[in-house]
Amino acid sequence: MSHSLNPLHAPQAGAIQGIIIALTAFLPILAIVSLAPAVPTLIQHFAGVPYVETLVPLMLTAPGLVIAIAGPCTGWLADKFGRRKLLLSATLLYGICGTMPLYITSLTGIFCSRLGVGLAEAVVLTIANTMLIDYFDDKQRRFWLTVQGVIGPALAVLVLASSGYLTALRWNGAFMIY
């Protein structure tokens, strides 16, 4: 990873940046929690696909695998291309790949979109945590890490309820959360 910024020239951030960084930590939770209520519906919808009972749960966890594989490289990419530019690009990729299952109907296509979500998450999480270190001193960092720990479970409950409702409306409704 990159070396620390010179404290005399370190960028300063306020509450808005802290909230944004805290919310980005919720993305991996969103990727898994949002689809959990949809698993039975997705298995039923793709009943004609061989091994669907295995493929749908794998699709659910695919972003985590990509995070584990791509995560170590994302710090280098952030240093090479710039944090802000890469963060914005990854956030756009997250939105595009997250909503793709609303427009595509093949399990393979949805699986690929989930891999894209994982790649975007790897970049967003790495850069967000790096920015937390860059922008905040130790005391502020502890505060924003606590905020992350508090809002994650609260948002997860909201996402679970919303996902269940949206899945009841249509087989791919859970992807509307993205």
Question: Which residues are covered by each model-predicted region?
Answer:
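Extracytoplasmic
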Residues: 16-50, 74
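Residue-level signature of the transmembrane alpha-helical cores
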Residues: 24, 87-93, 97, 113, ...
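Residue-level signature of mid-helix packing/kink "hotspots" within the transmembrane helices
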Residues: 33, 63-72, 122, 156-157
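Extracellular/periplasmic helix-loop-helix junction of adjacent transmembrane segments
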Residues: 38-68
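Hydrophobic alpha-helical transmembrane and interfacial-helix anchor sites in secondary transporters
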Residues: 42, 77, 165-166
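Conserved MFS/SLC helix-loop-helix module at the cytosolic interface between two early adjacent transmembrane helices
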Residues: 68-108
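Cytoplasmic helix-loop-helix junction between adjacent transmembrane helices
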Residues: 107, 113-152
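Helix-loop-helix hairpin linking two adjacent transmembrane segments in secondary transporters
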Residues: 109, 138-139, 147-178
